[in-house]
């Protein structure tokens, strides 16, 4: 990892927890040592963004797990970046594979969300990744480059964007991409950014890995030169998340 890229660890709590259990988790996180050279962001369920921001130590940022592409309006069940900021969160996760494949969000919609979230001043954790059949068909690069292109077309300021490579076959399955598999895709993504955006953006943009990251797998993954951090699911709800935060130490 280049020294200019600050290690980034996101915890995606998904649709989990209640105030009591999340309060206990927050207590653990507040007591944890967070290295000065590591950025930590937690993404609670929407109903608990306010709660998490009030309880979490300021050293840990808060993200929403999703947002919509416009400011206000007749969009029942949606939240806007402006609302997210009003609750004290500063980041949003967009394009997560569960949004793409469970809720049918298209590349185009995700791109529009990215553009609006950035315009409203949120940082964006933009997720990309291939399914198992796509990897087996040998089209991993084609899929992730197409997804990345739509995101890229909607980004003006790369300083507020973190790319999260999440192979769909490794999310919640217990299968983790090997450090070599992760590094290979991250390196190719950085090369794509260099060719299609700029060398400066390729060098400065953090590309983090998601997909069954645990306390046991994080250190070797973190040692790869193009792995700049993690987006953690299940393990972010457990005390081992502290080990993942400290994976570079």
Swiss-Prot record:
Enzyme Commission code: 5.3.1.1, 4.2.3.3
Chain residue numbers at which the record places covalent cross-link Glycyl lysine isopeptide (Lys-Gly) (interchain with G-Cter in SUMO1): 142
Gene3D superfamilies (UniProt xref): Aldolase class I
A biological process from GO: glycolytic process
N6-methyllysine found at: 194
MF term (GO), any: methylglyoxal synthase activity
N6-succinyllysine carried by residues: 149, 156, 194
Modified-residue entries (Phosphoserine), positions: 80, 106, 159, 198, 212, 223
Residues bearing the modification 3'-nitrotyrosine: 68, 209
Metabolic or biological pathway: Carbohydrate degradation; glycolysis; D-glyceraldehyde 3-phosphate from glycerone phosphate: step 1/1; Carbohydrate biosynthesis; gluconeogenesis
Main location: cytoplasm
Presence of keyword RNA-binding: no
Active-site residues (renumbered): 96 (electrophile), 166 (proton acceptor)
Catalysis: reaction(s): dihydroxyacetone phosphate = methylglyoxal + phosphate; D-glyceraldehyde 3-phosphate = dihydroxyacetone phosphate
Classification via HAMAP family: TIM_B
Family as reported in the entry's similarity comment: Belongs to the triosephosphate isomerase family.
PANTHER family to which the protein is assigned, alphabetical: TRIOSEPHOSPHATE ISOMERASE
This protein's name: Triosephosphate isomerase
Annotated source species: Gorilla gorilla gorilla (Western lowland gorilla)
């Amino acid at each position: 990892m280049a020294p200019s890229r600050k290690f980034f660890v996101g915890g995606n709590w998904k649709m989990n927890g209640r105030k009591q259990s999340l309060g206990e988790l927050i207590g653990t996180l507040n007591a944890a040592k967070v290295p000065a050279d590591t950025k930590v962001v937690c993404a609670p369920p929407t109903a608990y963004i306010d709660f998490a921001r009030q309880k979490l130590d300021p050293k840990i940022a808060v993200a929403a797990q999703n947002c919509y592409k416009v400011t206000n309006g007749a969009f029942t069940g949606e939240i806007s970046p402006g609302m997210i900021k009003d609750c004290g969160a500063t980041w949003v996760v967009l394009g997560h594979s569960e949004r793409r494949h469970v809720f049918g969000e298209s590349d185009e919609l995700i791109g529009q969300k990215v553009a609006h979230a950035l315009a409203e001043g949120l940082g964006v954790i933009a997720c990309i990744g291939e399914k198992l059949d796509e990897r087996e068909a040998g089209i991993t690069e084609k899929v992730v480059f197409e997804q990345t292109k739509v995101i890229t077309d909607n980004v003006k300021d790369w300083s507020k964007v973190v790319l999260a490579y999440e192979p769909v076959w490794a999310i919640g399955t217990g299968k983790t991409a090997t450090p070599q598999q992760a590094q290979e895709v991250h390196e190719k993504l950085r090369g794509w950014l260099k060719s299609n955006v700029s060398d400066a953006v390729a060098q400065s943009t953090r590309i983090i890995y998601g997909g069954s990251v645990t306390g046991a797998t994080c250190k070797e993954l973190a040692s790869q030169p193009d792995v700049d951090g993690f987006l953690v699911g299940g393990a972010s709800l457990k005390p081992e998340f502290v080990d993942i935060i400290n994976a570079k130490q």
